[in-house]
């Protein structure tokens, strides 16, 4: 079991609870001690004859076939499948996230048993729950009819995701991330959650641009790239060229050099008609969070990602810090449009699922069979158990509901003019809002998002 990613997920939720309750939870076990304790307990369990096996040998399978539609028209939809209602209620995590084909069809092979499918197409559609049974070597056919419950498109709004990765970020194309999805799969994933536009922002290259621009069936593809700088990530939106931040090394790595490279690439993006954005400015890694010495020049960017889909939008997280900073920038008169991006590296959202099930299994063994580990571990195990019981239900709730692509939407007002440059211009001007579900548009005396309103006192004086 690879523990690093699991620990990072635990720490995200721990940080949130610490911020909410103003207490420290990891004072007795730091990151390394957590990993060492889990590895030790896993070996103790194995020595006692307990081995983790996600899928029992000889499992029998059947097939589920689904057809989704809006009225009588096929629709691309997201499908979440739980193995049964009891697991969902107990938060014992067992979830598959799938995406239908363009014609609304889905066929998937599943172990025999009882299931429930949750089918939706984003916040403007109803959610349909369909229970079904899988029988050995049989095909179970189900249907889901989705109803449109909101019509923001009719009022000039369009929804999209500005931060997503594909196979072009992987080692196959010179990248470092284990992403396997093609641009076509990414587009269907975005559409399954109600997106009408999207930016495919791979690392290190612009190789996806030609293929991404072909994804134009009821969808507006925006070309982009996420630029690595070694002290932050910059999103170039709407530029076809490969803008590169020249990372200085050795004695040449000075604050002035780093600062000037930020200025240069943002200027280049703007000159080429693009929009420069700072991504996840408070990320946990030094190489991916924005250099804290450079906030004085943040206006070289035109937008700022305050909601990153890899972490909850909750107190204490990188998103909460970015949101707070964005508000303080507004107070200083520095106006950047707030955006969100899923930062998806896996459209199926199953990065943690084997890990979460493994941790459930291990903690179940440890709590039921304390005899498997030496008494010298009692204090650490007791603390780990307390941490697990306090943090795990909250964390699983986030993974189940929110750890999927495009959870938070960018809604941009274009008045029906949905070409890439028109969408980017609307973002520049702040004609947008972000939401993870509630759809609220607001006007003050006929003025909506992004328009400067002059407040007057009772005498009519500004």
Question: Which stretches of residues belong to each language-model region?
Answer:
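A metal-dependent hydrolase metal-coordination microenvironment
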Residues: 127, 150-279, 285-287, 292, ...
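Short amphipathic alpha-helical heptad-repeat segments
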Residues: 6-13
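Sec-exported extracytoplasmic/periplasmic mature domains
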Residues: 191-195, 331, 428
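C-terminal functional module detector
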Residues: 10, 41-63, 67-85, 89-105, ...
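Acidic, His- and aromatic-enriched active-site or binding-groove loops in soluble protein domains
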Residues: 222, 226, 301-310, 362-371, ...
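Charged, low-complexity interaction regions
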Residues: 18-31
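Short, flexible loop/turn segments at beta-strand junctions in immunoglobulin-like
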Residues: 108-110
């Amino acid at each position: 079991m690879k523990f690093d990613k699991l620990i990072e997920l635990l720490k995200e939720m721990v940080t949130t609870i610490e911020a909410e309750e103003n207490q420290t939870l990891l004072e007795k076990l730091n990151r390394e001690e957590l990993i060492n304790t889990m590895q030790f307990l896993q070996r103790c369990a194995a020595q006692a004859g307990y081995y983790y096996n996600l899928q029992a040998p000889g499992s029998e399978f059947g097939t589920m076939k689904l057809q989704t539609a809006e009225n009588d028209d096929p629709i691309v939809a997201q499908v979440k499948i739980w193995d049964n209602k009891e697991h969902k209620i107990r938060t014992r995590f067992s979830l598959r996230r799938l995406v239908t084909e363009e014609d609304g069809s889905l066929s998937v092979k599943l172990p025999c048993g009882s299931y429930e499918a949750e089918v939706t197409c984003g916040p403007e559609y109803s959610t349909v729950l369909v229970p079904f049974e899988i029988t050995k070597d049989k095909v179970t056919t189900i249907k889901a009819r989705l109803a449109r419950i909101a019509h923001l498109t009719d009022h000039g709004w369009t929804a999209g995701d500005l931060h997503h990765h594909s196979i072009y970020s992987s080692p196959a194309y010179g990248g470092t991330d284990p992403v396997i999805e093609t641009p076509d799969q990414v587009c269907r994933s975005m559409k399954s959650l109600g997106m009408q536009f999207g930016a495919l922002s791979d690392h290190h290259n612009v190789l996806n641009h030609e293929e991404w621009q072909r994804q134009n069936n009821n969808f507006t593809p925006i070309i982009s790239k996420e630029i690595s700088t070694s002290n932050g990530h910059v999103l170039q939106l709407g530029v076809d060229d490969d803008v590169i931040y020249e990372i200085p090394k050795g004695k040449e790595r000075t604050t002035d050099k780093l600062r000037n490279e930020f200025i240069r690439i943002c200027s280049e993006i703007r000159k080429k008609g693009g929009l420069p954005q700072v991504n996840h400015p408070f990320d946990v890694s030094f190489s991916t969070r924005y250099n804290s010495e450079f906030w004085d020049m943040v206006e070289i960017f035109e937008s700022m990602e305050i909601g990153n889909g890899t972490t909850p939008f909750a107190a204490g997280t990188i998103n909460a810090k970015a949101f707070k900073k964005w508000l303080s920038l507004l107070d200083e008169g520095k106006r950047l449009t707030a955006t969100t991006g899923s930062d998806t590296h896996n459209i199926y959202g199953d990065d943690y699922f084997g890990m979460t099930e493994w941790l459930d299994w291990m903690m179940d063994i440890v709590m039921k069979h304390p005899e498997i580990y030496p008494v010298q571990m009692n204090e650490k195990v007791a603390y780990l158990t307390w941490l697990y019981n306090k943090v795990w239900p909250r964390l699983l709730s986030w993974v189940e509901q929110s750890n999927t692509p495009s959870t938070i939407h960018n809604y941009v007002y274009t008045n029906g003019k949905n070409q890439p440059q028109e969408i980017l211009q609307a973002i520049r001007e702040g004609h947008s809002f972000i939401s993870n579900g509630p759809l609220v548009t607001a006007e003050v005396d006929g003025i909506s998002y992004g328009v400067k309103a002059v407040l007057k006192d009772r005498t009519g004086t500004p």
